[in-house]
Amino acid sequence: MSIGNTIHFLQVPYAEKDEAKALGARWNAERKQWYYYGEEDGRFEKWTPTPVMQLSDLSEEQQSMIALAKTGKNVLVDACIGSGKTTTIQVLCNEVPEKNVLYLTYNTLLKVDAKEKIRARNVTVTNYHGFASMCLEKAHLSAGISDLIQTFLKNKERIRMPKYDLLVIDEYQDIEQEIAEMLECIKKSNPVIQIVAVGDMKQKIYDKTTLNVPVFINQFLGSYATVTFTKCFRLNAELANRLGGIWGKQITGVNQKCSVEVMNLDEVTAFLAKQKTSDILCLGSRRGKMSKVLNNLEDDYPDKFNKKTVYASISDDDSSK
């Protein structure tokens, strides 16, 4: 294929599809993805996905986890912050083309990223509400987004569960009671399914359940091997050591380019304005400085930052913890 016919697939949010189309992007109905032909074009830079990682790109810890998972064993991964746990899952999915894989993420942000980086056609990537919606639709049932999982559980005897060889759970620490019940349904319909659960109890974001997650995940996996990720690619050695001391776990920082800089709100706004919206995740109080910065970005750059921009915030009750 000549350079002029090289195809470049893009990661275009639904809210920005008209903009991409106006710049010359085309729609691939089979992949359900926007693309363009030719040499790399700066017009599409903000939608250009990051390169897909290969097995050889991973650390020794990450490669050992994939090697263990490929033996067919259940695996529990205790991964420190910034250790590339989600990236490792994505590479694993690309490494097992012979398996029918269900990869469950906790939120939409992770789902979008995973769909872009997993090229294998044998992998279903979705969040929990998306999986419930898919199953309900096949059973000719419907529910509002907030009732999807409850409706799934109420009608579980009517639902014909798809068959899977491998269940991958990302961010298992955030599993809630209803999600735990959904996972049990998946396992019941696939009694010999292999399970790989990846997470870090120290990074638990959602804490609105009485479910004892460590007890549940131990029972759910049954017989399993444990792998630990200790290398943090996000922090330098000093910061990682401090955080590890606070959390009481080993974290080895390997990113010596990492630095912490104190900025005022105007400086933060100017800095974020230069970043890709897909690279930004905001955590903080809805009534705090985070919201003020986001409002400033929307006022100053409405075409780039608007209500469709993906970000996460903790509840106001948790903001002081």
Question: Which stretches of residues belong to each language-model region?
Answer:
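Accessory DNA-engaging acidic/polar modules
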Residues: M1-L55
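Short, structured coil segments at secondary-structure junctions
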Residues: L23, A120-R121, G222
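Active-site-proximal or metal-binding-adjacent scaffold patches in catalytic folds
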Residues: G24, E30, V75-L76, D165
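Short aromatic/hydrophobic-glycine micro-motifs
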Residues: G24-R26, V123, D299-P302
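Conserved pre-motif I regulatory segment
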Residues: T50-N74
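Conserved helicase motor core of SF1/SF2 NTP-dependent helicases
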Residues: L58-E60, N74-N100, T105-V112, H129-F131, ...
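Short basic/glycine-enriched coil/helix segment immediately N-terminal to the Walker B
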Residues: A69, T151-D165, I186-N190
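Inter-Walker segment of RecA-like/P-loop motor cores
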Residues: T105-T108, V112-D113, K117-F152
